[in-house]
């Protein structure tokens, strides 16, 4: 802004509040946030990829893969992007198996391997026979699923090489 920019694009999750704060102080600059928000300002707008479609398709695959209809989802936090993923995944699974249920464990963190592993273990031990995840650290979940023979879905990274026997797919922005 100090260099004369009239458009600012904020691309990082977690920058929403800061972007809105700066937008309110600079009404002559247009701010564009890549994410979800219900905030509305004359110089502030949001956009997010339509991730519900690929999550719905992954849910359909999960519905075809699961023998029990009990699906697990390791999620970071109940923020809009994550909730869209969970709901779309479950609706897709229910398209195939009307009785499918998605059991969710929120870790409260994006990148805590220990919490992610604990959450995946909890879901598997409760009878979930397919696991999906929305975490920034997929490796511990994928490794656990590979060792347990549990089909797994990912988010934002194709890590098929880590779990060639159980990897199904991932939702990745391209």
Regions found by a protein language model. Name each.
Residues 1-174:
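A residue-level marker of the well-folded mature domains of exported/periplasmic proteins
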